[in-house]
């Protein structure tokens, strides 16, 4: 059961949380180096 339920839970985590972390880290990188 867990093997069937895990991908349906793992895909949204990677699809939503990873881009959010990437955007946040990019934002902090820009703020830190003042590229704007």
UniProtKB/Swiss-Prot annotation:
NCBIfam families: PS_I_psaI (TIGR03052). Signal peptide: none annotated. Pfam families: PSI_8. It comes from the Eukaryota. Keywords: Chloroplast, Membrane, Photosynthesis, Photosystem I, Plastid, Thylakoid, Transmembrane, Transmembrane helix. InterPro entries: PSI_PsaI, PSI_PsaI_sf. It is found in: Plastid, Chloroplast thylakoid membrane. GO terms for cellular component: chloroplast thylakoid membrane; photosystem I. This is Photosystem I reaction center subunit VIII. SUPFAM superfamilies: Subunit VIII of photosystem I reaction centre, PsaI. Belongs to the PsaI family. GO terms for biological process: photosynthesis. It is a single-pass membrane protein. May help in the organization of the PsaL subunit. The chain crosses the membrane at residues 10-30.
């Amino acid at each position: 059961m867990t093997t069937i339920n895990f991908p349906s839970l793992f895909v949204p985590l990677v699809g939503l949380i990873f881009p959010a972390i990437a955007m946040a880290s990019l934002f902090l990188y820009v703020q830190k180096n003042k590229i704007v």
